[in-house]
From Swiss-Prot:
It comes from the Bacteria. One of its GO terms (molecular function) is shikimate 3-dehydrogenase (NADP+) activity. One of its GO terms (biological process) is shikimate metabolic process. Keywords: Amino-acid biosynthesis, Aromatic amino acid biosynthesis, NADP, Oxidoreductase. This is Shikimate dehydrogenase (NADP(+)). NADP(+) binds at residues 83, 129-133, 227, 250. Homodimer. Belongs to the shikimate dehydrogenase family. InterPro entries: Aminoacid_DH-like_N_sf (IPR046346), NAD(P)-bd_dom_sf (IPR036291), SDH_C (IPR041121), Shikimate_DH (IPR011342), Shikimate_DH-bd_N (IPR013708), Shikimate_DH_fam (IPR022893). The gene is aroE. It comes from Streptococcus pneumoniae (strain CGSP14).
Length: 284
């Protein structure tokens, strides 16, 4: 990697973040595209967020990525928001356009790009969870023309989830069905008519638990996706594959949301196939 007086910085900002795979992805991309850039991880306190954003202008950076807990907190410090960032209410990418800081959310686009030979337009989706990743997938699905979305959360989370779905309906005219995860018969019925089933919860990161009961029967044509990428195969994905269904983990989402950010910063396409090979060799 070339480092000199002309090198431009990009960074991922979060807390914690030292475990991040993003520097590996972006620095490989800078090198592969002969871009004079370097990407680092900044673990900061909330009190340093305003100054960190100011440094994007000060040091003429490409921009930054954001992860928890700063995806929403960063918004007041930005000059503009993209349509999807406004709809989601969260930003994962800030682009420095000649000192004008624009917030984007590439998570949803990254998720749908990682699905093999699948487009969400006109399809039905069942989504487990309603956190930050789920919101980005929800909003992008609506923007891309999904025909039906069923969101399942634990009954204790229903009240907290409904206001966001109501806001989405106000802004887009699209009604999302909200259901309790404990109602297994309803979960089975929704999955049976779906084209895509997504686990957007953290259940399965322990390598042992699954967000759905194992007696759920999956339709043959259903594509199953999990946003988790460590472990590489969660119990949820293993269960789906045991029924003969195609199943995708979250590593592709991580790569393709990064590719969207990289293009916004540099105007260049990230060589995703080459980097995917490096990623799977390193993290599988």
């Amino acid at each position: 990697m070339k480092l000199d007086g002309y090198t431009r910085l990009a960074a991922v900002v979060a807390n914690p973040i030292k475990h991040s795979i993003s520097p590996f992805i972006h620095n490989r991309a800078f090198e592969a595209t002969a871009t004079n850039g370097a990407y680092v991880a900044w673990e900061i306190e909330a009190s340093d967020l305003a100054e960190t954003v100011a440094n994007i202008r000060r040091y003429q950076m490409f921009g930054i990525n954001l992860s928890m807990p700063y995806k929403e907190q960063v918004i007041p410090y930005l000059d503009e928001l993209s349509d999807e960032a406004r709809l989601i209410g969260a930003v994962n990418t800030v682009v420095n356009e000649n000192g004008n800081l624009i917030g984007y959310n590439t998570d949803g686009k990254g998720f749908f790009k990682c699905l093999p030979s699948f487009t969400i337009s006109g399809k039905k989706m069942t989504l487990l969870g309603a956190g930050g990743a789920a919101k980005s997938i929800l909003a992008q699905a609506i923007l891309d023309g999904v025909s039906q979305i069923s969101v399942f959360v634990r009954s204790v989370s229903m009240e907290k989830t409904r206001p966001y779905l109501d806001k989405l309906q106000e802004q887009t005219g699209f009604k999302v069905d909200l259901c309790a995860l404990e109602y297994v018969s309803e979960l089975q019925a929704r999955i049976a008519e779906s084209d895509l089933l997504v686990n957007a919860t953290s259940v399965g990161m322990d390598g042992q638990s699954s967000p759905v009961p194992e007696n759920i029967v999956l339709p043959e044509t259903l594509l199953v996706a999990d946003i988790i990428y460590q472990p590489f195969e969660t119990p949820f994905l293993k269960w789906a594959r045991s029924q003969g269904n195609p199943a995708v983990n979250g590593l592709g989402m991580l790569l393709y949301q990064a590719a969207e950010a990289f293009q916004l910063w540099t105007g260049k396409e990230m060589p995703t196939e080459e980097i995917w090979q490096s990623l799977t060799e390193k993290y599988q």
